[in-house]
Amino acid sequence: MNKKILETLEFDKVKALFEPHLLTEQGLEQLRQLAPTAKADKIKQAFAEMKEMQALFVEQPHFTILSTKEIAGVCKRLEMGADLNIEEFLLLKRVLLASRELQSFYANLENVSLEELAFWFEKLHDFPQLQGNLQAFNDAGFIENFASEELARIRRKIHDSESQVRDVLQDLLKQKAQMLTEGIVASRNGRQVLPVKNTYRNKIAGVVHDISASGNTVYIEPREVVKLSEEIASLRADERYEMLRILQEISERVRPHAAEIANDAWIIGHLDLIRAKVRFIQERQAVVPQLSENQEIQLLHVCHPLVKNAVANDVYFGQDLTAIVITGPNTGGKTIMLKTLGLTQVMAQSGLPILADKGSRVGIFEEIFADIGDEQSIEQSLSTFSSHMTNIVDILGKVNQHSLLLLDELGAGTDPQEGAALAMAILEDLRLRQIKTMATTHYPELKAYGIETAFVQNASMEFDTATLRPTYRFMQGVPGRSNAFEIAKRLGLSEVIVGDASQQIDQDNDVNRIIEQLEEQTLESRKRLDNIREVEQENLKMNRALKKLYNELNREKETELNKAREQAAEIVDMALSESDQILKNLHSKSQLKPHEIIEAKAKLKKLAPEKVDLSKNKVLQKAKKKRAPKVGDDIVVLSYGQRGTLTSQLKDGRWEAQVGLIKMTLEEKEFDLVQAQQEKAVKKKQVNVVKRTSGRGPQARLDLRGKRYEEAMNELDTFIDQALLNNMAQVDIIHGIGTGVIREGVTKYLQRNKHVKSFGYAPQNAGGSGATIVTFKG
């Protein structure tokens, strides 16, 4: 869309209204780049995003996003091979933290159906390794000691050397007190010195670093600390070199992910912008309009967003309506009405909410043109008429059926008769070309054109003759009328003079009386419509209140049910645990047959109440996830007090964590969680026993290929129980060859199981060492 219309309608000022609601520099940049589009799919997407964000705010009214700075330049430097400094790493660290918080928020989100927003939430990346690396930089811009073992070693040596210097100087302060001007340790040129009286300067061996202005004090670094100070200076150089190496190393680790991080930053900004739109809706009672497929416009109680205390008006630009001609005197708000229509269309086509009531519809226009104001006449020293005509000629050459045209004071600035004729001719040309046009004029001749011409409608701005002030109410379908006689009377002009004047234009008076009647009818209709709207608003408020109450009651009910289910589940679990222990004791002390033990266990399970399926229990899910650490969680290593990030879990249950550049192996008791991430729910896989029939009787097969070790062992245990219950004499276990870990686990399990008579690898033609055949005791 042409830039001139955006300047004329002051679209940048409108966009500035959304800035206070933004939290990120990425969102601010996207807002500033925002422009209207004629692509219906993009507009629909923007509208859908706003509606989903509104629904999200109903459930999460305090939803927020971590503030972030622009990182496009940082990522570009990385891609070009540059190494980052600490400040740049802190910007990236902030973006990764914002991304992780949004992912966690989305994972915990309930009772909201998302589609467009889900797409953005799910495109965010997870970088647990990088998060651990970036923990090396604290928010004060300091590289932590744990960033590398070498850095920690150097800083320990610096600390020890500085302690030695302090100790030596403190001893000298006591020993040489009478030779010093003050009993303090001073600092000169980065060295620790003693303030020695000039008369004793030769009594204390060392390096002179400064002399006081009076010459009475000489600042000497004692010989005893010179060597230590030189060591410290050397260590400081080593520290700087190691810090530079750390910056280079972490830059290399981040570099492959620069594009992904930049994309995450854009998504964060996009979500921030959508959030800002909804905050604007809440603040200004704006709405997401409907999108018309045929350029039909219906604006209910629409306001100009930049006008304080703006009067709300209705505008209906039907599919067949080509032109709306607003007639009547100046200063009544005609120009504001033009700008309101144009600006509302620009806002909607830019994916922004509009200041109107629900039920409002907007069209889609490829271009919006306007001739408003006298900018050209000032710039080019042209007359008002020449300025308008120059602009209109240019516009007429560009408009088509997909354009919206706004013309202010059409035909003004020349002879009234010629100006009116030109205005009608221009409107007729636009009508025949089916170009939607809203025009303002003060020529009375255009009233007749609006009445007599098909697909053209008159309109006016209401004027209160009692107060002699415009009300700024838009009256569609009612042409403007002159109020000169009424105003003259109220201002004290003689009734005789007013009467003489009115007799000279009897015909016009007849027209004015008709217009007056139309105004009265329009006002009456508006009052009725306002009353209907008030009732609708009350009904909407009542409906919202009832829905809110209903949802709250349902939540309370669900909470109580969940508590009861949890208690019941705990009781059942406790009973089953006790039954397992009893059966274990029986098995170790008695000669019960295997199938009798399994049958007894099954009977005990039947005695317990039916176990409630808590897989959908939100409370339990959150409690479990809160207790269990997961990959990507931030941790504090208890022995060091340093932060890191979990990167993987080992087979023995221990965890690998990235703490700066150091990778550590920790047990759960050696760290605390800082903020757990919500992992995606993983459906439990059932162990399926596939029965087959052959000459040897009932058999079964279990396939463990592709399973993790713990998962495979659990499935094997359940499978053997089921096989014994079915009195199977023999089963096949397919574990594959692979690394041999699962095969070895199967072997150890079968060796321990007292119900197994024998087992061995399958024949070569039946799987060989990739499968084990198990025979049970009779």
From Swiss-Prot:
Occurrences of domain Smr (ranges): 702-777
Domain of life per record: Bacteria
One Gene Ontology term from the biological process aspect of the record: mismatch repair
InterPro entries, alphabetized: DNA_mismatch_repair_MutS_C (IPR000432), DNA_mismatch_repair_MutS_core (IPR007696), DNA_mismatch_repair_MutS_sf (IPR036187), MSSS (IPR046893), MutS (IPR045076), MutS2 (IPR005747), P-loop_NTPase (IPR027417), Smr_dom (IPR002625)
Disulfide bonds: none
SUPFAM superfamilies: DNA repair protein MutS, domain III (SSF48334), P-loop containing nucleoside triphosphate hydrolases (SSF52540), SMR domain-like (SSF160443)
One example GO MF annotation: ATP binding
EC numbers: 3.1.-.-, 3.6.4.-
One Pfam short name: MSSS
First-level EC class: hydrolase
Family according to the record: Belongs to the DNA mismatch repair MutS family. MutS2 subfamily.
Complex and partners: Homodimer. Binds to stalled ribosomes, contacting rRNA.
Function: Endonuclease that is involved in the suppression of homologous recombination and thus may have a key role in the control of bacterial genetic diversity.
UniProt name for this protein: Endonuclease MutS2
Organism: Streptococcus pneumoniae (strain ATCC BAA-255 / R6)
